[in-house]
Amino acid sequence: MNVLELSEQEIIRRNSLNELRAMGIEPYPAAEYVTNAFSTDIKAEFKDDEEPRKVSVAGRMMSRRVMGKASFIELQDSKGRIQVYITRDDICPDENKEMYNTVFKRLLDLGDFIGIEGFVFRTQMGEISIHAKKLTVLSKSIKPLPIVKYKDGVAYDKFEDPELRYRQRYVDLAVNEEIKDIFIKRSKVYSSMREYFNSKGYMEVETPILQSIAGGAAARPFITHHNALDMPLYMRIASELYLKRLIVGGFEGVYEIGKNFRNEGMDRTHNPEFTCMEIYVAYKDYNWMMEFTEKMIEKICLDVNGTTQVKVGDNIIDFKAPYKRVTMLDSIKEHTGYDLTGMNEEQIREVCQKLNMEIDDTMGKGKLIDEIFGEFCEGTYIQPTFITDYPKEMSPLTKIHRSNPDLTERFELMVNGKELCNAYSELNDPIDQLERFEEQMKLSEKGDDEAMIIDKDFVRALEYGMPPTSGMGIGMDRLTMLMTGQSTIQEVLFFPQMRPEKITPKDTPAKFMELGISEDWVPVIQKAGYNLVSDMKEVNPQKLHMDICGINKKYKLELTNPTVDEVAGWIAKIEN
């Protein structure tokens, strides 16, 4: 790497790295470092009246206070931080004091990984700490971390720019302790859900992510190509149709937690790659599934937070079951004043126009109703609410309502103004299913690129017979947002999808060389901030000369400095 691409701190750290090796200390040792304790456990288990406990810990050095022959550092491991007391004579018991005077005080930097062996004690200030007897270098960091300072529980100099945090999540996790807590809770959400399903006897399964037909949801898929089979394949938008095939095959209850992919927009609640859970249970209906779902979410919230109440933004959301139930058409009537019951497509289109909605000719009856609900109703449901009994046109995989043939036995759970769950009494009539698929194809021909494609193999599976079944899907990322009180999906994804990083435009060395500039001086000029030839056009030659000669001296490049007249000659050659 060109030294001009490095900061001053990075150069110092690389020099320290080389000096460690020259001393015979490998800064990246291969051997296992055995630990027997974590910071939080040491603090929780400490007792003043017991024999000092011997411990071996490892982690990042996050702060250091050197006071001559004694020092304090703060060590951060995977669970938290603990103070370590280090003295020269303890870690250097013989005549050679290099480990303290040279390695610890000068060659180690904040962010380096070290191992500490010693015993636990309480300082005169009352802080539980480790008295170090041995220090081991485990990994040298050559790029400095942003150091967040804490005083009286308040953080200063925080690493908080959202784009930087999401792009460099590894730094975010290293310096912002509260971020790690979000992902620990995310893991608890998953384990609590699995525990709930497994306790009922339902089996976790895996179904294909690469599919020949993108089915199970109304969404735009990612498309790829399988070279060996010379055929298009689709990244999974839902696992529904494969899971139902397993119910046909004889499993009574199956679920899958896995990645889905939708080639659509990104915003505060959508990422093109997301995690979804879908579960299907034979011999159940959507009424049973509503009760099953609310009990599951109540359990998860208790397991993760110790309470059923969570603060999300300005709202306190209570996940204690049971939840309110409202039919979709009743909700629309309540929030718009229009009763859509019995209306045909043209009548609903007129309602949309009266409501000043933006609609187009590709939208069928179901899409129009969905747009009305989304614009006027969805955002009003803050507390958990089941929206039930969706119109038939909106739900091609759902069983017809037992008491109204225009509706289906479907519900969505709304929380904090957004959909969280989607569930049905599953359609198991193969003839009806084929007709619904054919209706979807008509919508596709009208231009609806989210309409479902006919999956003939799935229809064939239904022809062999599928028992009455209820299914439910839940967005795990949105569930985690709610359980951790986060307002954006990016906060609960380790590595959210990002736009490409902006790269500073630079002219090629050849363009600078056309002005008579030596190739060796091009990176120096660009280091000074003149990335394009045109950047030098209006610059005073003396200033440019001073800038580049200063860099030559600072970085000890030992290049022969040009004269001011030579620099002026470069600038004079720049064309208008």
Swiss-Prot record:
GO terms for molecular function: ATP binding; lysine-tRNA ligase activity; magnesium ion binding; tRNA binding. Mg(2+) 1 binds at E412, E419. InterPro entries: Aa-tRNA-synt_II, aa-tRNA-synth_II, aa-tRNA-synth_II/BPL/LPL, Lys-tRNA-ligase_II, Lys-tRNA-ligase_II_N, Lys-tRNA-synth_II_C, NA-bd_OB-fold, NA-bd_OB_tRNA. Mg(2+) 2 binds at E419. Its EC number is 6.1.1.6. Its cofactor is Mg(2+). The keyword Protein transport does not apply. Pfam families: tRNA-synt_2, tRNA_anti-codon. It catalyses: tRNA(Lys) + L-lysine + ATP = L-lysyl-tRNA(Lys) + AMP + diphosphate. It is found in: Cytoplasm. PANTHER family: LYSINE--TRNA LIGASE, CHLOROPLASTIC_MITOCHONDRIAL, LYSYL-TRNA SYNTHETASE. Belongs to the class-II aminoacyl-tRNA synthetase family. This is Lysine--tRNA ligase.
